[in-house]
Amino acid sequence: MDNQFFKNIEKKTGVKMQDVMNLAGSLQNANFKDENTVRSVINRVAQMANRRVPKELEDKIVESITSGKEKLDFGTISKMMDNK
């Protein structure tokens, strides 16, 4: 990918692409049926996005992902956070 592309994303979102790449790398072999793993991912994404995730919403996201109803990706978590 073009380095300027990443710089534009960083500028618009405030999220460093290195942080995104590090998170993506840590997810490759993660067990998404494990509640603690999913909570950790939610907290990392929330921290990167500078968003607070209320406990009730976190519980809903965890239940959706660990039950297999939802796939774990930034889009899914972002959508759930926006629908609070």
Curated annotation (Swiss-Prot):
<dbReference type="GO" id="GO:0030435">
    <property type="term" value="P:sporulation resulting in formation of a cellular spore"/>
</dbReference>
<keyword id="KW-0749">Sporulation</keyword>
<keyword id="KW-0963">Cytoplasm</keyword>
<dbReference type="GO" id="GO:0005737">
    <property type="term" value="C:cytoplasm"/>
</dbReference>
<dbReference type="InterPro" id="IPR025942">
    <property type="entry name" value="SpoVIF"/>
</dbReference>
<keyword id="KW-0804">Transcription</keyword>
<dbReference type="Pfam" id="PF14069">
    <property type="entry name" value="SpoVIF"/>
</dbReference>
<comment type="function">
    <text>Transcription factor involved in spore coat assembly and spore resistance. Required for gene regulation during the latter stages of sporulation. Regulates the transcription of at least cgeA, cotG and cotS. May directly or indirectly control the function of the GerE protein.</text>
</comment>
<protein>
    <recommendedName>
        <fullName>Sporulation-specific transcription factor SpoVIF</fullName>
    </recommendedName>
</protein>
<keyword id="KW-0805">Transcription regulation</keyword>
